[in-house]
Amino acid sequence: MQTSLLKPKIIAVESLGENHAKVVMEPFERGYGHTLGNALRRVLLSSMVGYAPTEVTIAGVVHEYSTLDGVQEDVVNLLLNLKGVVFKLHNRDEVTVTLRKEGEGVVTAGDIELAHDCEVINPNHVIAHLSKGGKLDVQIKVEKGRGYVPGNVRRYGDETAKIIGRIVLDASFSPVRRVSYAVESARVEQRTDLDKLVMNIETSGVITPEEAIRQSARILVDQLSVFAALEGTETAAEAPSRAPQIDPILLRPVDDLELTVRSANCLKAENIYYIGDLIQRTENELLKTPNLGRKSLNEIKEVLASRGLTLGMKLENWPPAGLDK
């Protein structure tokens, strides 16, 4: 009787467009498609290293609720557009770049003055529109990081040393934009109970979908290697106690779920501002929310399921220190 587990012998990559690909792996033993697909998907969404703007200083602006003469966008929309610029650094962890432009016209990511070891992946990305006499002078700090880090939980040392006019951004470092997977039936000779894993991956262009899969697999192998070399400790009591790590996706605002306006407003009315707040609520609790019906509940459940989450989950140490409400 065969006791060894099958390993994939066919790995195919099909391009679906720029920075978008479908990766097919088969055959897997029954059940391993979901086991590995879900693990890879969660690592791809939460643990990939990338680059993002983390701080912005705009000449003539003290805070994000300001406006600039001659600039069509207000500062909030300007910051959102800056967050959409995809940077890539070479052999360094942070850099400060400058965006200066004046006169009527469109300001794009290609107008940013870059250092030799920094590049912009999407130079045609629109940042702002200037009218006659308009002027824009922006300093942008770009850092290397992992996952998603809200600005309100980041630490910058002495609070009194903050620079007036410096705006701290929520940073989405992940170069992976979307990931989904499906498990289909596979066949090897007479066996028809095998799995075929199909992964659909879209990246920002900092890395290719194929490289994203490789990196996520290496992360999983590195983490699981600890269990392969498992050894008992002298006393469990001597092990240092650590606070449970919180999945970065739980720190994202519920607005990132892109719910309908009705559903989003109902959640905020119940002081549900973060995904971590939402998943701790049960279906019955949400149905008691005014104006939130079964249709909105099903929408919320589907959006959470697409991210590997469900309602009624339990979280320790929530909310984390420094999380604004």
UniProtKB/Swiss-Prot annotation:
GO biological process: DNA-templated transcription
Database matches in Gene3D superfamilies: 5' to 3' exonuclease, C-terminal subdomain (1.10.150.20), DNA-directed RNA polymerase, insert domain (2.170.120.12), RNA polymerase, RBP11-like subunit (3.30.1360.10)
Disulfide feature: none
Cellular component GO terms, alphabetical: cytoplasm; DNA-directed RNA polymerase complex
Residue numbers spanned by region Alpha C-terminal domain (alpha-CTD): 246-325
Keywords: DNA-directed RNA polymerase, Nucleotidyltransferase, Transcription, Transferase
EC code(s) of this entry: 2.7.7.6
Chain intervals for the UniProt region annotation (Alpha N-terminal domain (alpha-NTD)): 1-231
Subunit annotation: Homodimer. The RNAP catalytic core consists of 2 alpha, 1 beta, 1 beta' and 1 omega subunit. When a sigma factor is associated with the core the holoenzyme is formed, which can initiate transcription.
Written domain comment of the UniProt record: The N-terminal domain is essential for RNAP assembly and basal transcription, whereas the C-terminal domain is involved in interaction with transcriptional regulators and with upstream promoter elements.
Protein name: DNA-directed RNA polymerase subunit alpha
